[in-house]
Amino acid sequence: MAKHLFTSESVSEGHPDKIADQISDAVLDAILEQDPKARVACETYVKTGMVLVGGEITTSAWVDIEEITRRTVRDIGYVNSEMGFDANSCAVLSAIGKQSPDINQGVDRRDPLEQGAGDQGLMFGYATNETDVLMPAPVTYAHRLVQRQSEVRKSGSLPWLRPDAKSQVTFLYDDGKIAGIDAVVLSTQHSEEISQKDLHEAVMEEIIKPVLPAEWLSANTKYFINPTGRFVIGGPMGDCGLTGRKIIVDTYGGAARHGGGAFSGKDPSKVDRSAAYAARYVAKNIVAAGLADRCEIQVSYAIGVAEPTSIMIETFGTEKVSTEQLTLLVREFFDLRPYGLIQMLDLLHPIYQETAAYGHFGREHFPWEKTDKAAQLREAAGL
C-alpha cells in the first residue's frame, strides 16, 4: 500500500450536539439508577435560550428532567449569558410519552434469554493495533485534543477559553503504518478580549503540544488554530444541537463503517447502542488476542427476535486464522442476543452520561473495553 492520508475529528462537551447527547444520557442514567428495567428513548434539542427534551420513556422511576438538564449544562460550563447559553436562565421544555406497546410486546419475554431486539438494524464494531487502546490514531488524538481543551478551561489557567471546541487530525500512513501527523485543526470558542496571536500561542503550548507525540510532528506538519480568526459566538447560540448528530465522532472517526444508529438517550434494550458496544468488545478481544491486526465486525437484528440475523467479520488481510474460524469463535465465546450482551457487559447501570462526550470507545474503564476473552480466543484458535 502506498502512502495515504486519513483524517478524523472530534468535538468538545460544549458543542451543541454534545450538549444534547449529554442531557439525553443524564436523563437515562437518572432513570436507570431507580429502574434498571426502564425503556428509555430520550432526544434533546438545544438552541439559544432553550432546551427541549422529548421521547418515549416507560418506567416506574420519577426524575426531575428540568433539574437534570440545568445541572448537565452547568457542569459543561455554560453558566452566564456572555457565553451564549446559561444553565440558570434557559427555558427547559419536556415532551415525553411512553414506549409503544407494539414494540414492548416484541422486546419483553417470560424467559429473559429470549428478550427480542428493540428494533431491526445493523451495527459495526472495530479495533486496530495502531494505538495502545486498540483504536484508530486519528480519532483517538482528536478526542484527546478537545479533552485537553476542557481540562485547561476548567482549571482556569486559560480563563478566556469557552466550552465549544472542535478538533481534527490528519495522519500520514506509509504501507498501512503511521508515518506522522500531516495536519492539525483546533477551533475553540473564546472570550472577546483575547488576541489571535496570544490565542494561537496558548493553544499550541497548552493544548496541542502536551497531547500529540513529538515523534509524529515535523516541520511539515500544518497547524490551523481558529482558522476563521474569531470564535466568540458558539454553543447553542452559534448552532442548534440535536441528540445523535455526532455518530462518527462517537465511534471510529470514519475508519470503520457505521450502521447509522445513534447511541445517546437509549437504554440497553436498544441494539443500536448495546450491540454496537458488544461489537467493539468482540473486535477488541480478537485484536488483543493477536488473531488479527485489524478487525471489523457487523451484527444485525430483527425487531422482537433474540438471535442476530447475521454476523460478519472483516480483517483486511491481517488475520492469523481464517475469518470463518473467527466467526465460529465469536459465536462460541460471545452471547450476542440482547439479554446476553446486556449481561455480558453489565449494561443496566447509570454509566452513560460519561460516554456522551469524547468517544464511546477507547476509554479503558468502560466494560466493553475489557480484553478478558483474549486469552481464551487465542487458546481456542491454537495460537
Curated annotation (Swiss-Prot):
GO cellular component, one term: cytoplasm
Annotated region (Flexible loop), positions in chain: 99-109
EC number(s) stated in the UniProt entry for this protein: 2.5.1.6
Cofactor field: Mg(2+); K(+)
UniProt subcellular location: Cytoplasm
Recorded catalytic activity of this chain's protein: L-methionine + ATP + H2O = S-adenosyl-L-methionine + phosphate + diphosphate
An example Gene Ontology molecular-function term: methionine adenosyltransferase activity
Residues the entry annotates as binding K(+): 43
Pathway where it operates: Amino-acid biosynthesis; S-adenosyl-L-methionine biosynthesis; S-adenosyl-L-methionine from L-methionine: step 1/1
Main location: cytoplasm
Coiled coil regions in record: none
Binding residues for Mg(2+): 17
Cofactor note: Binds 2 divalent ions per subunit.
Assigned keywords, A-Z: ATP-binding, Cytoplasm, Magnesium, Metal-binding, Nucleotide-binding, One-carbon metabolism, Potassium, Transferase
Binding site for ATP: 15, 164-166, 230-231, 239, 245-246, 262, 266
Superkingdom assignment: Bacteria
Biological processes per GO annotation: one-carbon metabolic process; S-adenosylmethionine biosynthetic process
Oligomeric form and interacting partners: Homotetramer; dimer of dimers.
Protein family: Belongs to the AdoMet synthase family.
PANTHER family in the record: S-ADENOSYLMETHIONINE SYNTHETASE
Job of this protein: Catalyzes the formation of S-adenosylmethionine (AdoMet) from methionine and ATP. The overall synthetic reaction is composed of two sequential steps, AdoMet formation and the subsequent tripolyphosphate hydrolysis which occurs prior to release of AdoMet from the enzyme.
Protein name per the record: S-adenosylmethionine synthase
Protein's organism: Pectobacterium carotovorum subsp. carotovorum (strain PC1)
Gene: metK
